[in-house]
Curated annotation (Swiss-Prot):
Positive regulator of sigma-B activity. Dephosphorylates RsbV in response to energy stress. PANTHER family: PHOSPHOSERINE PHOSPHATASE RSBP, STAGE II SPORULATION PROTEIN E-RELATED. This is Phosphoserine phosphatase RsbP. It comes from Bacillus subtilis (strain 168). SMART domains: PP2C_SIG. GO terms for molecular function: L-phosphoserine phosphatase activity; phosphatase activity; phosphoprotein phosphatase activity. It catalyses: O-phospho-L-serine + H2O = L-serine + phosphate; O-phospho-D-serine + H2O = D-serine + phosphate. CDD domains: PAS (cd00130). The gene is rsbP.
Amino acid sequence: MDKQLNDAPCGFLALSEEGSIIAANRTLIKILDYEPEQVIGQHMNMMLTIPAQLFCQLYFFPLLKLEHHIEEIYISLKARDGEEIPVLINAIARHDSGASVFDCVLIPMRKRNEYENELLIARNEAQEALLAKQKANAELEIALETLKAKQEELLEINKQNQQFKLNTKRELELARKIQKNSLTEPIVNDQVQIDSYYNASSELSGDLYGYYQIDEHRYGIIILDVMGHGISSALITMSLHPLFQRQITQGLSPVKVMKELDRHLHSLFQNDEEARHYCTAIYLEIDIARQRIDYVNAGHPPALWQDDSGTQHLLHATSPPIGMFEDLEFQSSSLSYTEDGRLLLYTDGVMDPTASCYLFDLLKDHPDSPIADLKEKILTSLQHQKEAHHKSDDECFILVDVK
């Protein structure tokens, strides 16, 4: 590395395709308070906060491999003493001796407070200059010039911050639309009627669902809830979506579907145990011809089956959440029915925080209500619950009429 790059007023980092650090300039190593031998050869995760590790794994590296360049990505570094250092990253992908190398420039963003303090110092100096008549003219001129320069720097930083916020807002809005468009449409035929509701507590949600007609007589229904909220949870749900969509439409059993989702979650975090997320989920396969429901409930709130007589059966958890334990053996259960009935699946955002799911009573009190009317009653009840308990959580539920 040449001297100019080594001592540049910004950090420089060269990474392998797997994220290992090939080179780092003195400026970056000094910012992080490491020795060169403590950095070179290590994975980039050593200098990232946990959210930044997840962001890089699920967004930064895939996007860089796809686009071959990235501009003004905001993440937080972690110094040796644990201090978080906000930076903007510009990166390009290149080939060196047949291998992919990612060159990154890291620009620290922690100078704003320093600039504000310098402005206060400059103002005090100007006041002192006015009181000291013998130095007033010269010192006042210096102070005013300093103040002007610092104001311009602060305005530029504010401009950059505002642009970053606008860019982030646009990206989140696009991600929200993509997430919403991935949800399945209602199904209505002479065998079943399926409808759903989905509402994110923020721009992005950790809840996701899907339902599909597998063949002439079978239907697959799944609902998931990734721990946490916001971007990290939403990125994980979106990585699970194409996987369970393919498996369900291929007619894989509930046990095999859950096993593949569990394997996928473990593969996401195999190099970073601290960033690991788990996910509760329940998958049901309804066989109309056999009048049977096979399901696996992985740590999810129990689904409800209510038959025409009003009798309710809870489909309790049969296994721990996916992504929690390696080599987990999932257990399936079955429910046979002889008459028409109604299913309710939901995430914990629609549960009463002081009791069991109050929606069970609502279904029992309105056994003959069409699904559309029942959905409106549930939404009204949800609104009352939010107002009473000041709740703010992702909300998702599915209603199924089996005819």
